[in-house]
Amino acid sequence: KRIKWEPNVIIYYFLSRQEKWTEISIKDFNKNHINLPRYMIFEDSHYYETAIPLYKKYKFQKLLKPQQKFKLDNYYKKSGINIDYWGYFIDSEKFKMRNLESGFKYDILLYGFINKVAYPLRVKFFEVLQFLNEKSNLRIKHIPHPGYYKGALNKMPKNEELSKVINQSRFTLVSSSSYQILLKKYMEVPMSGSTMIGDIPPDYPELKDKMIEIKNDADHDTIVQTIKKCFENEYIEVEKESRRYGLMLSKTKNFESGYNLLNKITEQIINY
């Protein structure tokens, strides 16, 4: 027997700015349940030039953002967008620490799209690793990113498979992109038991003692010297704190936590 039910809130998720992720295929979306609260989740919310027109076109009442970015958030507010922070939430059954009976398999790992405009620091990381691969005995692991053409992402490790590689790596290089925002890697890596090396997003100073900082404008020599210090064990305390941080994230940034927070956010307007 089919149960008849009526929603009390509409939540629509957009991944990014490409057309395949921004077209709502629900017929008469703006005419259905017009009296219900409408929430919009836009994961790549740094693409405000796409998010703002979508928000207004489909008459959303609130934009749920995955991260804080002071300058960007002010722009949204000045454009009449009502924002709230939901956050990123990671599958802790897949991204987790695993026992390494033989120790770390890799000394340092790099993964993600290599692009000079979008990820200038990651490009420098890649160039430094090429140099170190020739000049040192470090066990370097690079997971090439095939690009974003159709079917390409199926060729690279994801979820549990990716977490296992991270877990096998003592250090993992991360960057906040040219937008200097918090990305999922800043959670995936510590949750999988590796210590991050990279820049700290300006709106997240609390990461300072939980990762090894390399500023976004660092030159190649600075990157090399910082990596050298890592293997001279100058950051042992940071490694310990990173592990504690990863365990904390597995309890506070898992899917159940995300579900509970989303309920809390939506209940505020439903019960208003």
Please give the residue ranges for each predicted region:
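Nucleotide-sugar donor-binding catalytic core of glycosyltransferases
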Residues: 1-7, 12-29, 35-210, 257, ...
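C-terminal "capping" alpha-helix adjacent to the active site of nucleotide-linked donor transferases
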Residues: 218-236
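A short acidic/histidine/glycine-rich donor-binding loop in glycosyltransferase catalytic cores
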Residues: 209-217
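Residue-level signal for the nucleotide or nucleotide-sugar donor/cofactor binding architecture
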Residues: 184, 217-218, 253
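A charged, aromatic-enriched C-terminal amphipathic alpha-helix characteristic of glycosyltransferases
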Residues: 232-270
